[in-house]
Amino acid sequence: PHPDALAFEVKEANGDHIGILYMDFHPRESKRSGAWMNSYRKQSALGKKVSPVITNVCNFTKPAGEDVPALLSFDEAQTLFHEFGHALHGLLSQCTYNKVSGTSVPRDFVELPSQIMENWASDPEVMKIYARHYQTGEAIPQSLIDKLEASGHFNQGFVTTEFMAAALLDMAYHTRTTTDLVNPNEFEKTTLDKIGLIPEIMVRYRSPYFQHIFAGGYYYAYTWAEVLDADAFEAFKETGNIFNPEKAKSFRENILAKGGSEDAMTLYKRFRGQEPSIEPLLKRKGLK
């Protein structure tokens, strides 16, 4: 690997080999922007056991000097947790066929393992563990945590509405029953009028530059993933311990290990004991 990259052997608590994880944190000329997870080798168990080789790739600024570590913004910390969730999905897979192992799941389910990790990133109990002053080691003060939480609630009514309007517009395009040509602007106006979108709130993407409409009507999956991750994290909170080992074991066995080998909602209900509720997401957004 590149000298900047770190390689880890991931093991079970008893020492058994799980897989290899590469962490490539910093930008360089040959890398594109953004952050992502890749599977260099997917897990499988057809005839012989094949362990996964996974990478997390980010573009975090390098340390400014020998005595200064790489300092992450809160958004970057969330990105790190998010991509690590995808990595866990790939590493902890226990499927027979690599075609359905790891992150090879329906598109509206693939973000659950990543987005649920962001809940720990923003939890005050966890932040006081990792969000520390790089010189003094002092944990982030509660006043800053409160401000971060308040900023997360800001304008959520507007943001949620524009996202949902775009999702409904996308779905309208993909549920048309005729092949007649339509004027995109007229179709958009008719659709948004039907759902009652007020003029003061514009759909997140106008039709002429709404690239997602060419990807199979999946734009709703972004919001649906939020419903799933908020409800799944609620399962941990309900135990009174967000690190509850039994609940974590259930999430691993029923979600992470299964990949796309079974129906996604069946797996979710097996973990959660019920269908996902929208209430935890509304509460997290400050809408209820």
Positions of the model-derived regions?
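C-terminal, non-catalytic "cap/extension" segments appended to globular domains
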Residues: 1-4, 9, 13, 17-20, ...
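Active-site-adjacent "gating/activation" loops or surface patches in catalytic cores
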Residues: 1-4, 9-78
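Short, hydrophobic/aliphatic alpha-helical segments
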Residues: 53-56, 95, 258-260
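A generic, residue-level signal for flexible/boundary positions that often mark functional hotspots
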Residues: 54, 66-68, 94, 204, ...
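Conserved helix-loop functional segments at active or binding sites
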Residues: 62, 90-97
